[in-house]
Amino acid sequence: MTEKSAELVRLNELKAFVSTKAGVKGLVDTKITEVPRIFHIPSSSTLSNNKPSDIFGLNLTVPIIDLGDGNTSAARNVLVSKIKEAAENWGFFQVINHGIPLTVLKDIKQGVRRFHEEDPEVKKQYFATDFNTRFAYNTNFDIHYSSPMNWKDSFTCYTCPQDPLKPEEIPLACRDVVIEYSKHVMELGGLLFQLLSEALGLDSEILKNMDCLKGLLMLCHYYPPCPQPDLTLGISKHTDNSFITILLQDQIGGLQVLHQDSWVDVTPVPGALVISIGDFMQLITNDKFLSMEHRVRANRDGPRISVACFVSSGVFPNSTVYGPIKELLSDENPAKYRDITIPEYTVGYLASIFDGKSHLSKFRI
């Protein structure tokens, strides 16, 4: 089969799959025993590409930080130091004692699962391929770019405080808890921005005053069990187009971050939330804080549930301009990026990350 004919076959298979609007769960419900070709990672890829240092006992672990430890001035300084080290060296860390009740964490995971396990005809009412739709269900929003497809279904929900969704726009299966959880996440986002601001050696309100906390996109994933997990990925490697991402994952696991050229498991910690530095944060901090590639491995167990909340100023019409923070610049540390708007950055983001290229690098001076 020629390369051209193989691509035509792939596109036809992709079109047939998307037209069902049943997602990956729909495939699994048919009791398939093999992963369709449109999900296969290239044969040249490997899921076990850790370096020897990882194999011979380096024991890399993503930092776990207790946000309840900053009750005194001295303790706050220690907490900020831990945040700084994690943001600079890992771009990832987990937080405990973050203020969101465990019951709310449980409820949002249950709500996400309820929606994805709804009658397919109910879910189809929310099916959309436009990432800008305020509430949308799909299997891979990046179907025009992503090859191969990822082994997951998702729904997105924009819960911007300035332009919130009307309750009736959210499916009943997850309506109340989406609204409740987004409020808690925005409060936590405010605290994290204070800590990150202080970690930069700046006023604690600088990130908030830059309007970095105006928007919230919830991306709620459902990873069905996979019969051949070594042939595909839950999510391909990528970075996030956010300032920070606040992620809730269940206990199944599969999330990995690239650190020192090794894929490191972000092992689930009961009650914890995963915080990752996004591309916008790396840009405005002039590479002081790092947005790191991460991915999700497919798993025979499942379904796996995760809720990723992208804290940003939103992708809808927004003229706010962002560039490296002036207080961080000097003759020895000049600006490494040009000023941009969030919508400008978002254009082409999906095409870049799933092509294995850094979108952020396109804006370097």
Swiss-Prot record:
UniProt keyword Secreted present: no
PROSITE patterns recorded: FE2OG_OXY (PS51471)
GO biological process terms on file: biosynthetic process
Domain of life: Eukaryota
Record EC number: 1.14.-.-
Domain Fe2OG dioxygenase: 214-313
Protein name, entry field: 1-aminocyclopropane-1-carboxylate oxidase homolog 9
Organism: Arabidopsis thaliana (Mouse-ear cress)
